[in-house]
């Protein structure tokens, strides 16, 4: 039997440890060092010849370092005669640069897809890509899982009396509709106008939220400006409470300050990105069992279809 091995980059080592624990398979040894000038050096410390290899590495901040580390690890494993290499990328950086929104700008998500393939990766597994069409940037299989696989059960366990699912912007309506359909709830939409990057202005509430428990769903929470302003607008319209479920906790800039303000009653995120701080109103749900199951099924050539909801 060919066997498989799991390697971790330095972006989210605890995530990789939890995956390996679920599979009862110790993480394989690889040394990742940096030279004095910042260059990354990798040494694979055990044989991978003929093995199916899985690399766990989010490309979160520092995005460029973590991306390069993934590529260099892949090159080292490919040159060490691994049979196949699957990249488990819980958070896929640069996904927000998925189209030409303005003249003379790059489509960086496509460039990253090209780099990943050129390095020698055979398959990618991720969760809640900012734009689903990024799967089409690859000529290799890409499994894009959904955060709702953990959020839905958490929401059900809350036993809300008068809940409604909300989208913090027009672009997230499809995601909100999917969650609402699964839970049998109505949806509300917060229509906003973005004046410039990382700043947004809430404009209008589409739907009735009076005396309701609003659950906002989104893929990424970055500066938390959009979510917090949406929560403020919803409460001004009579919402009883506002909870947000966001898969990827980027949480840059003044995000922690905004969340700590208490406008959001609760922020629920996953562990695709390690948190820099712990706040009483932040709840972390783990998606490591989901990715562990992806690894097991891919290795055994089993369908992963049931992991998509």
Swiss-Prot record:
Active-site residues (renumbered): 192
Presence of the UniProt keyword Magnesium in the record: yes
Reactions this protein catalyses: D-ribose 5-phosphate + ATP = 5-phospho-alpha-D-ribose 1-diphosphate + AMP + H(+)
The protein's required cofactors: Mg(2+)
Cofactor note: Binds 2 Mg(2+) ions per subunit.
UniProt subcellular location: Cytoplasm
EC number, as in UniProt: 2.7.6.1
Biological pathway: Metabolic intermediate biosynthesis; 5-phospho-alpha-D-ribose 1-diphosphate biosynthesis; 5-phospho-alpha-D-ribose 1-diphosphate from D-ribose 5-phosphate (route I): step 1/1
Pfam families: Pribosyl_synth, Pribosyltran_N
Main location: cytoplasm
Residues binding Mg(2+) 1, per UniProt: 130
Transferase recorded as keyword: yes
Molecular function terms from GO: ATP binding; kinase activity; magnesium ion binding; ribose phosphate diphosphokinase activity
Residues given in the record as Mg(2+) 2 binding sites: 169
PANTHER family cross-referenced by the UniProt entry: RIBOSE-PHOSPHATE DIPHOSPHOKINASE FAMILY MEMBER (PTHR10210), RIBOSE-PHOSPHATE PYROPHOSPHOKINASE 1, CHLOROPLASTIC (PTHR10210:SF41)
Family: Belongs to the ribose-phosphate pyrophosphokinase family. Class I subfamily.
Complexes and interactors: Homohexamer.
Name this polypeptide is given: Ribose-phosphate pyrophosphokinase
């Amino acid at each position: 039997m060919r066997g498989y091995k799991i390697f971790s980059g330095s972006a989210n080592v605890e995530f990789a440890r939890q995956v390996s624990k679920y599979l009862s398979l110790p993480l394989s040894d690889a040394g990742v060092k940096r030279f004095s000038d910042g260059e990354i050096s990798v040494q694979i410390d055990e044989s991978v010849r003929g093995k199916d290899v899985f690399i766990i590495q989010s490309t979160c901040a520092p995005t460029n370092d973590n991306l390069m580390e993934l590529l260099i690890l892949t090159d080292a494993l490919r040159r060490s005669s691994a049979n196949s290499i699957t990249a488990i990328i819980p958070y896929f950086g640069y996904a927000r640069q998925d189209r030409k929104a303005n003249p003379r700008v790059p489509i960086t998500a496509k460039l990253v897809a090209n780099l990943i393939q050129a390095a020698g990766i055979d398959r990618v597994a991720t969760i809640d890509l900012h734009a689903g069409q990024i799967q089409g940037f690859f000529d290799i299989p890409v499994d894009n899982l959904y955060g709702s696989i953990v959020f839905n059960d958490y929401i059900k366990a809350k036993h809300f009396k008068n809940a409604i699912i909300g989208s913090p912007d027009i672009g997230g309506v499809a995601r909100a509709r999917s969650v609402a359909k699964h839970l049998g709830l109505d949806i509300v939409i917060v229509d906003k106008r973005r004046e410039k990057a990382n700043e947004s202005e809430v404009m209008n509430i589409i739907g009735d939220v009076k005396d309701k428990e609003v659950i906002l769903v989104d893929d990424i929470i970055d500066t938390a400006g959009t979510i917090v302003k949406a929560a403020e607008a919803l409460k001004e319209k009579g919402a009883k409470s506002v909870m947000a479920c966001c898969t990827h906790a980027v949480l840059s800039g003044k995000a922690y300050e905004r969340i700590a303000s208490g406008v959001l009653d609760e922020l629920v995120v996953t562990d695709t990105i390690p948190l820099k701080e712990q706040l009483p109103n932040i709840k972390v749900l783990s998606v490591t069992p989901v990715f562990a199951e992806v690894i097991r099924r891919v290795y055994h050539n089993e369908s992963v279809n049931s992991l998509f909801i």
